Design a protein with these regions (language model features):
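Accessory nucleic-acid engagement/destabilization modules that flank
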Residues: 1-198
Length: 198
């Protein structure tokens, strides 16, 4: 199930008109579950950054945008998806995992695990790049279109509040394998994220 689906052009218009979060809230509440204030605030913040990312003439107006895609047979929700064609008309899907983290720390004794402040305390969670890559893997296994057509899946993480000069540990060499296949973009790297999408 996809909570919101449109073109890049309509996504930006919905954001600029102030109706995007309302549409997300209404659809998710009607079809799935109640939405808390913290999730609404999270959408407002992260999607403003994604609207800025998508305001690039090199990203086609008719590129597809999906928000809050619920992977079938799971409780996993993909934050942001961009779909489109390259210059050779090959289909591409870019999965973007959005985080508002300000700080995180490496965990050396577990693969692709980091620790960060969540829910009032420090918690161990998957590295955001690994989380995005795992969604690609799930979609490859559960989506018939991806299985039956030559659609290329790409993943990345966008931590728009994350200042690597203060908290550099998410790029520790222990995470190189996942960062090489699912890059991470942080505060001040919006142009790099745009280039990855293009």
């Amino acid at each position: 199930m996809i909570i919101y689906s449109s073109t890049k052009q309509s996504f930006i218009q919905d954001f600029e008109q102030g109706v995007l979060v309302k549409k997300l809230h209404q659809t998710l509440t009607e079809k799935y579950r109640r939405v808390g204030e913290s999730e609404i605030h999270s959408w407002q913040t992260s999607l403003s950054y994604m609207a800025n990312v998508m305001r690039d003439f090199a990203i086609p107006e008719l590129a597809g945008v999906a928000i809050e895609y619920i992977v079938p047979n799971t409780q996993k929700r993909v934050d942001f998806i961009i779909t489109g064609l390259d210059q050779q008309d090959n289909e591409h899907v870019v999965i973007v995992e959005l985080k508002q983290w300000g700080e995180a720390f490496k965990v050396t004794d577990k693969d692709n695990i980091v620790s960060t402040y969540l829910g009032g305390g420090i918690r161990e969670v998957t590295h955001p790049s690994y989380q995005a890559w795992s969604y690609c893997s799930l979609i490859e296994n559960f989506n018939e279109d991806v299985q039956n057509r030559p659609i290329k899946l790409h993943s990345c993480a966008f931590l728009h509040n994350f200042d690597e000069s203060i908290s550099p540990e998410l790029r520790d060499p222990i995470y190189n394998d996942i960062l090489n296949i699912s890059p991470m973009f942080t505060l001040g790297q919006m142009d790099s994220l745009r280039n990855f999408i293009k």
